[in-house]
Amino acid sequence: MGRAPCCDKTKVKRGPWSPEEDSKLRDYIEKYGNGGNWISFPLKAGLRRCGKSCRLRWLNYLRPNIKHGDFSEEEDRIIFSLFAAIGSRWSIIAAHLPGRTDNDIKNYWNTKLRKKLLSSSSDSSSSAMASPYLNPISQDVKRPTSPTTIPSSSYNPYAENPNQYPTKSLISSINGFEAGDKQIISYINPNYPQDLYLSDSNNNTSNANGFLLNHNMCDQYKNHTSFSSDVNGIRSEIMMKQEEIMMMMMIDHHIDQRTKGYNGEFTQGYYNYYNGHGDLKQMISGTGTNSNINMGGSGSSSSSISNLAENKSSGSLLLEYKCLPYFYS
């Protein structure tokens, strides 16, 4: 057997209370009290309401000692502190806030305070993660071992030391963890889109088998193809050189287009490096021969590049001169 209903649900009014109903309830209690029996109270007060609804309306809204209006910052602080200590025991929390009801505090928590707390926690976490990277040289702090993202920062070691070429190990040492290709590019330039990640023929998107491109890098790409592919699962020599060159070209903080040859043309220095002659620093600094190689069109000679592709890797796709990045447009 269950508890008998306090009233006939079909004969009572539901929904928000009207000002007239509030006035009737308040006037009757001020004159006669509730009589200790809320079940018979609605009939005596002339209300078509359930006895439970009358009781809650009085206790939570109409009592003369109830505070209405916005919560103060001090009340917010008390609620935060008590919630952290005892959880959602609203009646106990209400005992520490004179004039506030447990129902009022619960509703305030669910509608405003919880969102405020989550927002504050999120901002604090972001600040805590970013603070060690604001000045990596001057601050002696322990950096996280495996953060999910590389925080952006105004500090850039490449701009301060143009002779220090960017490498994975360099960026990893700055940030205190092993960085992948995508993370390195995001760290160098957060504006690079993340949706143009070209991988090898096996669609392996690991940081060893692909490279992230900016839409602005290859405006003249007609079909997005992989820079190179693996041969029997082993990265080819030309693939590693392509990635190394592209990494150097992505770091444009200390590169002068007019003297370094980064104007979208395939220079003799690039060709020599692909062909196994010269080193990368010589190619980047422009100390070697910088004459342009004609890659096509009238009077063009593409045999040197064709021979290079055959000699280096039959499965590799060479980077054509049309697709070199235009950083300085």
Curated annotation (Swiss-Prot):
GO terms for cellular component: nucleus. One of its GO terms (molecular function) is DNA-binding transcription factor activity. Keywords: Activator, Developmental protein, DNA-binding, Nucleus, Repeat, Transcription, Transcription regulation. Induction: By a shift from short days to long days, in the axils of primordia on the elongating stem. Residues 122-162 are annotated as: Disordered. Residues 122-131, 144-154 have a biased composition (Low complexity). Changing K142R: In strain: cv. Ag-0. It is found in: Nucleus. Changing K222N: In strain: cv. An-1, cv. Bl-0, cv. Bla-10, cv. C24, cv. Br-0, cv. Cal-0, cv. Can-0, cv. Cnt-1, cv. Kon, cv. Ct-1, cv. Cvi-0, cv. Cvi-1, cv. Di-1, cv. Di-G, cv. Edi-0, cv. Ema-1, cv. Ga-0, cv. Hodja-Obi-Garm, cv. Ka-0, cv. Kas-1, cv. Signal peptide: none annotated. GO terms for biological process: axillary shoot meristem initiation. It comes from the Eukaryota. Its main location: nucleus. Changing I245V: In strain: cv. Cvi-0 and cv. Cvi-1. Residues 9-62, 63-117 form the HTH myb-type domain. Changing L170F: In strain: cv. Cvi-0 and cv. Cvi-1. Residues 38-62, 90-113 bind DNA. It holds the Pfam family Myb_DNA-binding. Mostly expressed in roots. Also present in shoot tips and flower buds. Coiled coil: none annotated. Transcription activator of genes involved in the regulation of meristematic competence, such as CUC2. Positively regulates axillary meristems (AMs) formation and development, especially at early phases of vegetative growth, probably by specifying a stem cell niche for AM formation. Modulates the negative regulation mediated by gibberellic acid on the timing of developmental phase transitions. This is Transcription factor RAX1. It comes from Arabidopsis thaliana (Mouse-ear cress).
